[in-house]
Amino acid sequence: PNPVNSEAIIAESRVTSFRKKHHLSEITVLNADGRRYVYGLPVYNTIQKEVSFSADKAVADIQTGLVEYTPGTDNTIRNTKGKDNFYGAEEIPAYAHSFLLTGIVSADYTDKTGDGITDDDMGDAVKFNYCRPYGNNYMFRWRTPLAENKATYSEGLKTDYSDDKGSYIYGQKEIWYLHSIESKSMIATFTLNDPQRGELREDAFGSKGENGGTDMQQPLRYLKQIDVYSKADYVKNKEAAKPVKTVHFEYNYELCLGVPSSAPGKGKLTLKKIWFTYNKNNKGQKKPYVFLYHPKDINDPGSDPKAAYNPGYDPKGFDRWGNYKDARNNPAQMSNADYPYTLQNGNETNNGKWDSTKAAMHAAAW
């Protein structure tokens, strides 16, 4: 067992109800020097459903790009909206959206007993272990957009009020976290926040179901610390093992306030501080790397008028190139949907969005 990370390493069968025999199960990349990178853990999206249907312009919001609908009616074959009562849905069978790195082996590596990377093998090897804190059967429910009983709005022709459409994508997927990395001589463990100890993550919540809504009972985890041990000490002393080095992380939720997947009044998980300790000596805590961010929005009372670098969440806050664009700068109070063009009076403020992080003056040298 991991003396720091209480989560168990998960063993996953190569063939399950959704991991089919004909699916790719492992990818190996061979480098020019003979070293092999083994991506042996396929991470699955088990459900993906894309739905579009006729929608009512009267309950659409052009500013947010969302339209309300009646679940069980509008998003079914019983749709009666618009001129064509359109409803369409496409479901994609389970597929691997990522392959996680499970091992790096040298050109002369030999698996002595055929049981994967172990200490009795010949050659150099690094093994990556993963965990699923919520168990093998847990699937994270995701949806775009996340808002309950709302869909992404497509206005169609402005002169035709009967051709408006709504759409959403819903799915379920596996969630894996890195548990530990080990070589023959060293091991690094990755400790996640523990909700049972009140260490709650307040963003990245999932969806209640296909019709959306933030499910605050479905939180993800964040990385709390990384501990590096001598493997001999780790194996011999278990919980009494002393880490050679520990990396600590501290967060808040000050960026992207108002994102629907966060708790009320919170933004996205934001890295604020990193510090290192050695052999459980806490002196390094006095010399952390501190990350500072500009105030959130020039239009919010009390914020710095010269530092509007980090605005709140805006689902339509982008131009036709995908770059951030505040619709309040558009002529005649037009929305970005109606005026998707890049503003020609750009300034340093617009160019600096999300790049305003800087190290605090008192941070220690790297």
Across the structure, where does each feature detected by a protein language model lie?
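Conserved catalytic cores of ATP-dependent inositol ring kinases
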Residues: 1-366
